[in-house]
Amino acid sequence: MEPYSLGEEGALPSEGHLPSFSESQVLNCSDTLNRDLGPSTRDLLYAGLSGLDLDPSLSTSDMPSEVLEDNLDTLSLYSGKDSDSVKLLEEYADSESQTSLQDLGLGALKVPKEADEGGRATGSTRKGKRQHSSPQNPLLDCSLCGKVFSSASSLSKHYLTHSQERKHVCKVCSKAFKRQDHLTGHMLTHQKTKPFVCIEQGCSKSYCDYRSLRRHYEVQHGVCILKETPPEEEAYGDPTHNHDVANQPPPSGLRSLGPPEARSPGSVLPNRDLLRCIVSSIVHQKIPSPGPAVGPSDTEARSSACACPTSLGSSSCTPASTPVALGTLGSEIPEETHPPRKEAATEVFTPVQSRAAENGVPDPPESELESESPRLQRPSSLEGWPEGSSLPACLPLFRGHSVPSGSQPSSHNFQWLRNLPGCPKNKGSNVFMVHKPPAVASREGSEGGGSGPSSTPTSVEPSPSLGTTQEELLPFPPALLKAPGEASSEVRQAAGEDETWAPKKCKPDCESFPWQSPTELGLQDAQNPGGLPSDATPLFRQLFMKSQESLVSHEQMQVLQMIAKSQRIFSHTQVATASAQRPGPEGKQSTLKPLQGPWPPQTLPPAPTVDSFQIGPGHSEPEGSPVRRRKTMPAVSRETSPGGPRRDTKGGPKVASAPPSLTGPGLLPSRNPDSSSLAKGTLDLGDIIPNAGSRQSQLGGDEPAGTQLVGKQGQGENGLASGAMRGEKGPACPRGGGYRLFSGHPRAQRFSGFRKEKVKMDVCCAASPSQVAMASFSSAGPLADPPRDMKSKLTIFNRIQGGNIYRLPHPVKEESLAGGCHQPNGGPTDWMESKSTFVCKNCSQMFYTEKGLSSHMCFHSDQWPSPRGKQEQQVKGQMVASVKRKAGREEGAVEDMKRHYDCSSSEPQDVTILSMLVSSGSCGVTPVVLSSLLQGQEKDGEERDSKESCQYRKRKKRPQPKALFAPPAPSALGEPGPGGCHQSCLHSPVFLVDHLLKGLFQCSPYTPPPMLSPIREGSGLYFNTLCSTSRAGPHLISPVLDQVDSSFGICVVKDDTKISIEPHINVGSRFQAEIPELQERLLARVDENVASLVWKPWGDVMTNPETQDRVMELCNVACSSVMPGGGTNLELALHCLHDAQGSVQVALETLLLRGPQKPRTHPLADYRYTGSDIWTPMEKRLFKKAFCAHKKDFYLIHKMIQTKSVAQCVEYYYIWKKMVKFDCGRAPGLEKRGRRELDEVERTEDKVTCSPRERPTHRPTPELKIKTKSYRRESILHSSPSAAPKRTPEPPGSVESQGVFPCRECERVFDKIKSRNAHMKRHRLQEHVEPVRVKWPVKPYPLKEEEEEEEEELGADMGPLQW
């Protein structure tokens, strides 16, 4: 490329350049990167360019302005063949790429139609050619969120995310979208076919579009698969690109990523295609299996051969090239301590000609990459250029950068990956090394690592052992490799500089190693020169491991699950054995020299024989930076993976138990602890991809005093301890304990398939237990102080529902606190080795992370948590504190969390989610009064077993009943919630009891579930008193709440243990009646009967039939409408007869004239007779209206009528219901109906097959046709009970045996039993339909004239109870 100069803050000298790629360069990468193993290209290349601009003094070719921001949603890293020697890569993959896609079951991707036309259809914001970034057209930032864009079109598209307008509406389902391409993708869901099928075992889901399948993999299986370009997102709209791809077949849907100028040798743009080649070549190496075994893996069939040129001098992007020791670069530089620095050092890929390898140099271990993965992913501070970073020469030079005369630290934070020619076809191979400048001591430099000069310029000089010149070693001047302030970064390379390398040649077929299962990972790359040793595995973390911040972004950590199905990980012993027995390139053991300098020498395992990646020493980020937040990850998290190395007493890694990638020049004290590549600490992949960042520095006791840490965290705070907590970050540490606390770059953490968005987050987090339960889906959020807070990515909830959701951390397991704390000798125990996988309790599916399990449980419950409000408001709105097991510990949360992983105390600290959410000023024992427990805050159905762990195990949610209205109770102990809603008295309460309070709670009474539905309408079932637990609350908590107002509450709990009331027999004086002692039976004769005699037969009623007939007639009159009160007072008539001493005349006079007159001393003086109320027509109409409006809520009916009590309304309803049920046929047309049925019976007589003399026996009469039960009222009214017709039951089978089948309801006779059965359906239908049809009109409110007339007609018979 043409040399470009930087501004005064730049990191590259003016003479630095990258040579143009020769015409003979051909990149032959064997396999398409068909798995989204890491951050997208934009995450790697375009982390932030706010401080860059083009040098106006240099001529540049046309450069699309939106390359840095455009169309990165579906950007994947592909590799492919390029028949044109000028272009590095073409977008359309070769047949091998398609084969690899088909191996995943995804099928060949279709080529976008617009790709051939050079067009692009991603919405109205991209039309025609793009503008060009220039000093006159600077980068634009969003005024709402501060996001930076390179063109106005990208910014206008971004503004759509802040707008609620959705102009594009689906014609099928009317769903609206903000962009046309979103609508186009949505239309795929309406097609009938579902060609995209999930290939996971036991899963047969199919989807109509690729994005849905990818989302299914991410959410359900926790695996990220290949991102397919949506059909609406095509190649760039530059027609000049057509001729470049005209000669190439478009076999798949891999769209062209940029116009030709982005691919040309003289392009000033960072070439993504080269990065794809790099990434593809590295990813598709074989992960060696442990042990000395050299045979191919059983999964070798999955790999595709690398089509490397057969010539010896050719080189490939794959690590099948001769590696060059990093020690050769600057081996003459004096070695010194590399202190961390405030500036964010960057990793740059620096190519090293493989010719250097021919002179014999030791291969560098690639473990240094391991700790750098978060740096490639961390968001830059305001997306600026990093301090002390080196600008790749192949990048466009943006504003604000000029070439400095000397190496000076820049004022930005930026991550960059140097673009290099992938396969220059010269003799030898290229080695890509990640150079990371040393860090300058940050504010906590005394804790970060060793101290030393931080401004010493670094230069890469050829090793004396090399026969090549510096120009031969590097395709660009060595000044490009140094960053301002890089304090002798070559010390990392000094180790093993005298070792020799056997020349390695590319095999003709350039065989690439297949992926192996995690149990087969080993170090047999020596036997396979093209293989990727375990030392190279940090590259996966650096390039392909996204942070676990977003909800379902754990799929990158589980990518090997999709490749190699194995769920197990190899142990420390396997790694140690493999590292000890790993042969060199020529079959002999090659050992790197111990690190030189002030650190104790360590025996280093042999270095890899593949392309090496060198990472400079770490640095301590500013406190506000996301990397600093990741520093708060406890070192214990790294130890959760069994493959992780143990630390010796000095804090250095034990060589016997550490993979070879854990040692070597990269293990320097200045290593940044924030470079933890494990998110959530319990990932099985941590053993396959060892985390060098979590290893202790080899300074040990010889470290400078400045590296020793506060709070007994010397081991954890060392530069290599990726999970160690910073002392001043103590309050946040337990919250994020064991997890990656912040995303790398905000775009690196985006949820696949969703648009990139950011949300500012407040990190002072306090929430109620229910909020914690609802937020347990999300992952650990950033936990730094709010002033230093950075933007983070939205979780899936934000993208689904929109809004801000604040990720609450997962609880720290108690056993992890005990077993995972650092012992005084620095050797943590493997407290999570047996719990490295998480199993869904519903479907038994295994997950590597808690986040994978929690997101999977979302789909079992079909419920997503709603977005949360600001967390400061939650802190103000609720009292949340922690109740710890050791009450004597009164220190502040800051010091307590500093000591969180210090094993000064042998007992496990009872730190639960509340203690992680508590503000920094909370003390040891502060009971929490959760007054909202009775309002159903714990109704999410989550069960957490504190004996096993405190982690969240989401269970399937049960449908919860609605809060029921009940009148407020007179008790003032518990105030009702909004709207007077109380927990049902028929619901057994649920306590969340702390360990200290378990013995204080009395056993709650168990109430069986009600027979009626708790959610039915009406207030009759629930009594208007509070649950008994509200009264018992202050009494129970008073021994604990000495200084807390007991009027708070209902129950004092900690979100620790959920105790539900199991069914049991309630025992006690509250539930059982007191039974008096048994007395002698003789005493019963003396006792007087206290009951009052209200009726007994008088005179000769029992013997004289005439007297009995007169009494029956009195009862019939009393039940008629003649009596005031309405026809149901048989009880009153008998009482009056008793008072009249058996005289029927006196009893009748009492009923008709003056009514029952009883003295106050009479036992029936206040007795209320059923049906004795008189309802006026107005009251009847009001009752009908109220009943139609409120159904059986008689309290509201009473409110509407106002003249009748609730009891009277209930009585009126049930009397009416009884009369409607039995007298529904008593209509004015009753006689007509009787005659009609009689005619039907007579007509059916002709069909009777019995003899004529038997026929009259079964001929029904009008009296028999009327059912005694149904028409009891009419028989009572028109005849005396003694004269009522009596039906004599016929012997069963007497008629059926003779071939006649009469109906038992209406006495119709049928000659076939089937006819009678069909006829019986008529009676069933009438029984259910007639009451509603007759008595309840459709429009009940207006009282029609017909109803009034009917009421008058029925008044004589039914009294006021009829309508």
UniProtKB/Swiss-Prot annotation:
Subunit-structure text: Interacts with DNTTIP1. Identified in a complex with KCTD19, HDAC1 and HSPA2. Identified in a complex with HDAC1, HDAC2, DNTTIP1 and KCTD19. Identified in a complex with KCTD19 and HDAC1.
Q: Per the record, what is one GO cellular component?
A: histone deacetylase complex
Q: Where do Basic and acidic residues bias regions lie?
A: 335-345, 937-951, 1244-1276
Tissue pattern of expression reads: Germ-cell-specific. Specifically present in testicular spermatogenic cells, but not in testicular and mature sperm. During spermatogenesis, it is present in spermatocytes and round spermatids only (at protein level).
Residue ranges of the region described as Disordered: 1-23, 106-137, 232-269, 286-387, 440-532, 574-741, 935-978, 1243-1298, 1343-1363
Supply the Pfam families for this chain. ELM2, zf-C2H2, zf-C2H2_6
The keyword Transport belongs to this UniProt entry's keyword annotation: no
Comp. bias intervals (Pro residues) = 597-608
Residue ranges with Low complexity bias: 453-465, 659-670
Q: What does this protein do?
A: Transcription regulator which is essential for male fertility and for the completion of meiotic prophase in spermatocytes. Regulates progression of the pachytene stage of meiotic prophase by activating the expression of genes involved in meiosis and post-meiosis during spermatogenesis. Maintains the repression of pre-pachytene transcriptional programs, including meiotic double-strand breaks (DSB) formation genes in pachytene spermatocytes and suppresses aberrant DSB formation after mid-pachytene, thus ensuring meiosis progression.
Q: Where in the cell is it found?
A: Nucleus
A single GO BP annotation from the record? male meiotic nuclear division
Query: Is Phosphoprotein found in the keyword set?
Result: no
Q: Which organism is it from?
A: Mus musculus (Mouse)
- List the InterPro entries: ELM2_dom, Homeodomain-like_sf, SANT/Myb, SANT_dom, Trans_reg/Corepressor, Znf_C2H2_sf, Znf_C2H2_type
Q: Give the Acidic residues compositional bias ranges.
A: 1345-1355
Q: What is the name attached to this protein's record?
A: Zinc finger protein 541
